[in-house]
Design a protein with these regions (language model features):
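Active-site cleft segment of glycoside hydrolase catalytic domains centered on the general acid/base Glu
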Residues: 238-246, 273-292
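Carbohydrate-interacting/catalytic domains
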Residues: 1-21, 27, 33-36, 42-43, ...
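Conserved, mostly hydrophobic/aromatic
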Residues: 20, 79, 89, 106, ...
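Substrate-binding/active-site clefts of carbohydrate-active enzymes
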Residues: 22-85, 92-263, 291, 297, ...
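Short, flexible loop/turn elements at secondary-structure junctions
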Residues: 21-26, 93, 110-113, 174, ...
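Hydrophobic faces of well-ordered beta-strands that scaffold small-molecule active sites
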Residues: 16-18, 87-89, 168-170, 269, ...
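Flexible loop/turn segments at secondary-structure boundaries
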Residues: 26-28, 94-97, 176-179, 218-222, ...
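Conserved alpha/beta catalytic core and glycan-binding cleft of carbohydrate-active enzymes
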Residues: 180-185, 256, 263, 288, ...
Length: 583
């Protein structure tokens, strides 16, 4: 589907992206680590985890391992060598949680992942259950010396990425903020900090009063008015009230422009729960239209990528989002076909496992909801911070770490099926996006278990090298980025599809069965000459993978191929075999 005048950034089409959950990637500066007892958060004091390799605990949100921006900088050469073109970071702004989807200050990078230059004040005493005397936290997160130093370090990260020809997308959470936010100040962090206005929780005279929807508004409700609207009822996630505050909208649009402009020069936004913003569809669409104008005016080449479940079409008409995180037309159909598992590992459906009709039907249905330029840069992930890791899904264990134990996430996994999924990912329309550690063999049930640390020093080198080779293949061939796609053949646990443009033609064949399969497929309808040769450029299997060239012959428009169990092959039409039909 094409909308006249709607374009998405060329660099984002088929770009290889890499998602980093910063606290769990690499600790490059231990001096900025959250300290045990630094502040009180959701029922307990926060805790610093000293063992980098310890599995996350059930209430992981207030436990910190120490990953930071310096750690990302330290590993940029690794990411560049892997073939990554775009780094997508989960939220980096000041926030009390490790996931940082509860923003405290949109103007600054959190010094706990940035730089702490002034570090004074006491930690909480054992048993203290509020933040009135969280002086160390107050110093770290409100002192301008720390905030500005953290922004400078972020600028360095962006410069180092751009120096390597790489880009960065950051996470924007504009539907809600956090209860620690300076506009609300429920935790009284800012009440005794210099240079800040009074928060709306504290006083009805706060300049931020209308940034939130309070259900009780009598004068005697303050100080301490906790009747504000929370996203899905969560009082730690106050919903922002765009309907009643033009100042709020203007401020957030200013933030949208600020971070994609000099000196920060971010290359795009990932928008959290973007369809939930506002209290009506009308307000939602109006806001995102203004957001697009603001971002594209500041940086026409910035991408706007939204988290979205369901039909995105009404936001993808050229005047709101560029694209979305691709659940319906990538993660879910591939997970069902290859594993039979739901993306949280909450359910197994035998009727979906290996079902080519369901797979093709789902893909056709959901892909038609995209504009072509949106589909080409849709974020195609196998895993992320909200769902179980794909490698764990290959063991078909239904449940979560709380019931099954964290060790169960790594038992009975099938790396060959993971490789099949990566072949899909690197040859399917969209921007293939790795979740940190997937390439190294990391496992995990749904959150928080999927937020384990990167296994530095104990990587699965077979998987790592396989990812590197598949990324290379993806980047070397434009057909995988912007070419056409056509289904060729489907049987139980067996699929073939074609990717092609005017210059190149590929077949991708997958056997997801536990036994070897020999299949004769009619392939000429996808533009292949009836007599031609195809050359193997990748073969993945249970024992590893191979890029050794192997020739297959198409005779009478048919390809006869044998694939071992749990294997995939990428075949390219030899240039000597005749012209490829036009797109």
């Amino acid at each position: 589907c094409i909308v006249p005048g709607f374009s998405t950034p060329e660099w984002a089409k088929g770009a290889v992206m890499y998602q980093i959950y910063t606290d769990r990637f690499c600790n490059g500066d231990p001096d900025n680590d959250v300290q045990t007892g630094e502040y009180f958060y959701i029922g307990e004091q926060v805790h610093h985890v000293d063992d980098w390799y310890r599995d996350p605990q059930p209430m992981d949100v207030r436990e910190f391992y120490g990953g930071d921006i310096q750690g990302i900088i330290d590993k940029l050469d690794y990411l560049h060598g892997l073939g990554v073109e775009v780094v997508y970071c989960n939220p980096l702004f000041v926030s009390p949680s490790n996931h940082k989807y509860d923003t405290q200050d949109y103007d600054y990078i959190d010094p706990h992942v940035g730089k702490i230059e002034v570090d004074e004040g006491r930690l909480l005493d054992p048993g203290e259950n509020n933040n009135i005397h969280a002086d160390r936290y107050r110093t770290r997160t409100t002192r301008k010396e720390n905030l500005e130093a953290s922004n400078r370090l972020f600028i360095k990260l962006v410069e180092e990425l751009h120096k390597r020809g790489m880009r960065i997308i950051i996470d924007g959470v504009f539907n809600h903020c956090g209860s620690f936010n300076k506009w609300l100040d429920r935790e009284l962090i800012y009440e005794s900090a210099d240079g800040y206005e009074v928060g709306a929780f504290v006083s009805p005279k706060s300049p931020y009063r209308n940034y939130f929807l309070f259900h009780r508004t009598g004068e005697n409700e303050w100080p301490g008015n906790g009747s504000y609207d929370g996203w899905w009822g969560h009082d730690t996630l106050p919903k922002l009230n765009y309907e009643d505050s033009k100042e709020l909208e203007e401020y957030v649009l200013g933030i949208a422009k600020k971070w994609v402009s000099p000196p920060y020069n971010v290359d795009g936004w990932r928008l959290d729960v973007a369809a939930d913003l506002g209290h009506s569809p009308e307000v939602n669409h109006r806001f995102w239209k203004e957001f697009r104008k603001a971002v594209k005016e500041a940086n026409p080449n910035a991408v706007i990528l939204a988290e979205h479940y369901g039909d995105p079409k009404s936001w993808l008409l050229g005047d709101e989002w560029d694209t979305i995180m691709n659940y319906d037309a990538f993660m879910e159909p591939i997970t069902w076909f290859l594993t039979g598992m739901e993306k949280h590992s909450d359910e197994y459906r035998g009727e979906c496992f290996g079902n080519p009709g369901d797979f093709e039907g789902a893909m056709r249905h959901h892909m038609t909801r995209f504009m072509t330029s949106s589909l080409q840069c849709a974020m195609n992930e196998l895993s992320n911070h909200d769902h179980s890791r794909f490698l764990t899904r290959t063991n078909k264990k239904v449940g979560r770490a709380e019931q099954l134990g964290t060790d169960a996430a790594g038992r009975g996994i099938n790396k060959a099926v993971m490789k099949e999924a990566v072949v899909f990912q690197m040859t399917w329309p969209g921007a293939p996006t790795l979740y940190y550690g997937d390439e190294a063999g990391q496992v995990g049930f749904t959150d928080p278990d999927n937020r384990r640390t990167y296994p530095w020093g104990s990587e699965d080198m077979d998987l790592l090298n396989f990812h590197r080779e598949m990324i290379r293949i993806h980047k070397e061939h434009e057909a995988f980025k912007t070419g056409s796609i056509q289904f060729v053949w489907g049987e139980y646990n067996f699929l073939c599809y074609a990717r092609y443009n005017r210059r190149e033609h590929f077949l991708v064949v997958l056997n997801n069965d536990a036994v070897s399969r020999t299949v004769e497929m009619v392939v000429w309808p996808v533009g292949l000459p009836k007599e031609c040769e195809l050359e193997q450029i990748m073969y993945s299997h249970e024992d590893g993978f191979s890029t050794n060239p192997v020739t297959y012959e198409v005779k009478g428009g048919k390809l006869n191929i044998t694939l071992t169990e749990f294997s995939a092959v990428v075949l390219r039409l030899k240039e000597t075999s005749g012209k490829v039909l036009p797109e």
